[in-house]
Each structure stands twice: as structure tokens, then as C-alpha cells.
């Protein structure tokens, strides 16, 4: 079995097949295996079976350890330059080109970043979001100091937050689309840090002679053309582009696999087993359609099981039982507001019939007069969680984290979290640290006369110290009141998410959502 690509899909497929007795060999053009996982320092969504609340790079480490355990051979710095219908590949390793013939081939080459053409787009300082992640999270280099992000999908939102974690200033986030494209919880944690969102805006030009010194954006109309007089200038040294991905399917086309043009790119036509139109050639992960890494790992396992059956290492009954199990996991991830069937559509109500926050879609944060309508936001005496998760997304770690049963989601993991008023919160903070979207806060009024406390997730360095005085910012990233740090907690179970507690006036405990130290 030959696997092309040592990312989440490729490694998962190789492991699945190796468990059944196959001897997979995996080729990857990079110096390290793991694909995009090692760039991803954020916690994943989903449930336990999807590695929810585990950081991406740790999932990568687990996959590599499992691949080693089952004897998967991984060849690095090896670029596959040819794939042929007879299940043959040519691989460039150093100065040599080698030829391999397999009994089955899985293509898991992933995707490449899209670019946008505008005046000055080739200047040094214009980079892709993936490049920014590589610089920060693999090489520990700041991509720039003042950055404008173009793109409000999950990649743009997550990378914007990581840029701030790396010490960069994100001066604005723009997107030509009229609505935020990614998860609202990702947008909210960027907005409360003070980053303004400019929806229905795109880049007109980048300024600077030899490198980026500024950028001009403008508002687009219904015809996607710039509206005269709407230009806005920002002093920046870096422009980061997060405008989608395209499947890297060239090898599949070379192998004469039947392809399909979709809005997501040029993808192979595959059956439920990952099999293409060419017998013995399979595809999994982003090369067969752009999704999250969690989905890619499941697709990889499905293809690995299918190849094991194709080569006689599993019966069809065993394969189908395994595929049914994995399909169930995959279907779970494809539910909710961001399900494939809803792409490009405006979903106006949650599954519970609650009006979605238009402010969240248009500005990146839920307005104060909207937040109260959601079931995770309640007023109680004593310390209690406030869950500002307002969209149906597949995620339930908060329910599992609370050992007192204060939080309930139910069997459908896309249901909005709700608070059980009959259960007593003990303020352990496990729900706060476990929330992949950082949307849970602990609130308590009357800690002392006229003042309450808000406990929030915090992942920035340097950490504030107890006694520090600063300001509390609201959901919109603007000043709401003075604040004092009263507690900072950490624990191995929090996985580097600190719990920062600030003291604010009682009437601000439902508004203060971020702490900023006084300059």
C-alpha cells in the first residue's frame, strides 16, 4: 500500500491498514510528517471520539506514535512526481527519481492556499495564513508587527487569534463576503480583543516600494465592485490572506481518475469507501473536498479499512461494519449550521428556534441585547457558568467536563449548551478550560460589596499578576470598566489555558469579557 501525503488523512489511513496486517509506505515532500496538524495549536471541536479539546499538534504527536507502533514506514523529503493508473508512482528523493509499484495507492495530498490578485499582491509582506502559522507555530518567528487579515472563515479567525498570541497586532479583519464565514465563537474571541471586522470589504492595493508599508481596503457592493469613497487606509507591515483552499489533485488527474468540478475545487469522484474510478486508487482528506482535519482523519481511516478489504485483509462484512462506525462519526461532524448543505446560506434560526445573532454575523460579536436569548446565558446566585455559544456546531466537551452536571447538551452534539438550574456549580473551571471556542465564563456577583468576579479563558503571555489593575473589554472589544486581577489558575487538565479572574462592578459581570493590562 502506497500513501501519498503524511498529513492527518494519510497517516490515519496507513495506521488503519497496518492494524490489519498491511505494510504501508508513506511518502511526504516535507521534512516532518503530520501535515497541517503541527501548525495547529488550538483545541479541536467535536466529541471525545473526534479528539475534542485536544490541541492539533498533540493529535499529530499521537498519530506519529501510533504509526511507529504499527510499523508504518514514512519517507520524508520525498516528492511524488508521477502517479499512473497501474498503481505505480515515481518519487523524487534528493537527486534521484525512484519507481514504486503498489497493490493500492491512497492519495492524501491535501490542499494549497488560494491567493487574491490586487495591486501590490506580490510584495514581500503579503503572505498566506498557512505561511503565517508555519512561521509562528513551527519556527517561532513573528510574521509581522501590524497585520491586516483578509478572510473571516475559520482559518482567518483562528490565525488572527494566533497572531495576537504571538505578539502581533491585528489592526483589522476584512472579508468581501457580507457575513462572517467561520464559527461565531472564533470570531467572538478575536472581536473581544479589540479587532474590528470589515465585512463586505476587500483589498484595493498594498502600499510600499520594496515591501508592505500600508494597505487600502474598500467596501464592495452587490456586484462585488468597490464602492467609490469607501476606501480605508491602515498602516501595516504585513497582509495575511485566508481566502480558501484548493485541493491538490494534480496526481489524481495524471492517473486518469474521473474528476468533478465543484465550488470547492477540482476533486475526484469517490464512493463511500474513498475509491476512485481507477481500481486500487483511493483518495481521502482535503484532496477529495475541503473540510476540517477531524474529518480528514476519519476519511483516512475509512480509506485504510477499504484498502485492507480490497487487498483481502478484511472481509466485506468487517469492512462495512467499520465503515458504518466511522460514517457515524463523520456525519456527526457534518451536522449543525455549518453542515455542507448550508454552505453559502444564511441560517436565521438555531435548531432550537432561536434567532441567530445578526450582530455576530455582521460584526463578529454578539450584542449585549442579543446574548440573553441563548440557553447558556442565565442569572443565578453564587458562582455559575455563562456559556456564550450561540450557533449549532458539533462540540460537547463542556458537558463532559462538568462533573456536577451543570451543563447539558444531550445526545445531539450540535445542540446549544444549556444550564441546569438545579445543579450546583463549584467553580472548578473545567468547563472554561475545556471549551474549544473559549466561550464559557464563570460569573459571580457580590463577591464584595458592589463588586463581582468574572473568570475567563486566557492564553496570552506574559500573564498578568494578581493585583494588577487594568481595564475590562466587552464583547465588542471596547472599554466597559476598570478591572483588577484577583486570581490566576492553571492545572495540567487545563492544557495551557489559564483561568483569569477579574473583579468588576456587579453591573458589569455580564459584559466584561476580556482583560487588558494598563499600559
Regions found by a protein language model. Name each.
Residues 1-365:
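Residues forming the flavin
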Residues 1, 228, 287-290, 351-356, ...:
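Ferredoxin-like iron-sulfur electron-transfer modules
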Residues 490-504:
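Short, solvent-exposed secondary-structure boundary/capping segments
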Residues 396-413, 430-446, 475:
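Iron-sulfur cluster-binding cysteine motifs and their immediate structural context
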Residues 478-492:
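Short beta-strand-centered aromatic/proline hotspots
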Residues 308, 475-477:
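Short, surface-exposed secondary-structure boundary micro-motifs
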